[in-house]
């Protein structure tokens, strides 16, 4: 780093190099892997907690975005050191990208002649020139390094590399256009798989231990192993056999749970309820929800597949049971809503994906966890759809591998919100009949904690009422 001892990043690296144990996060581990191991100090062993999130975190770290706002901000930041025509051309190209994105239907982009890809190609060429101009005369200059110029060049290089990657449309990447809730569009690129990156730049470099309460999907470790780049044929069972140099042996060990799930919790599945559709949450589901919440006396964490469903459920509950406070994600800071939920046992908290993981509310505050539907990925999710197609093209079952695997992991995480300590009791209610009627139901249930299971609503209601006595 040109700033030497004044650089906080360099100081942190030096401190890490002298440590016996370094605690970091998934994002930093991913950045280290993407940069060939040049970020973290040399190490013999890596222990990765919450490893069920590893693929998503590595995917996020390896993904890039471009938008008119990003291009405009980067161009203005660099304007002082650019020739006037280059700076003006970059700003004009931001406008061109805006028009190209507006003309593109949100979704995956696969053809090089697509207008938005052609726009990225022009942007790439302009950014390449800008990077060169931002770095010229550095070698001969006796002036102190200009920090702002260095940062502007780094930002412009990021735009160049991202545009270049998008234009390339490599088979290993997925490129797509998205639209935000406010109507702003942007273009994204993400790896089709991060298995190779993990295998070569993490597992091959040091002994690695992955830990999580939800690595066992469908009753075994094969799904997570495949996602992180390990082959089922490399699994070691029993006494360790000889491993070929080309193989990377791995073991899956289920160490059990301190909880007696079959005695502490009930899984209720609404078998008689209508299958979820596109028209929002059904009246029958809302009626089931209300009866369960009434029996629990509030004390409910509601995990919904969409913000629309969460809001509809909250409005229904407030109308049907005005004496029970209902908090809904989006009505305040999530941390504040969670604190209020934990402080008042009669309160309900409804929300979406942010609540499925990491919420830890032990005790009587949470006796009922409601899941409105099986959390399959959206069918129009470009990255998930591309991964599913890749599995199909390789002769596998794309739905079970990608969509059902995604749902199984979220169900395991969501259901895990109920039992947080040895004296917790309660009910997980899945208001989607497919969990017991569809062919993939067994796979999904095998991924969840082994609660005692029923499809009898009155039995679940009775259990909740007895807990309140």
Features from the language model and the residues they span:
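ASCE RecA-like P-loop NTPase motor cores
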Residues: 1-469
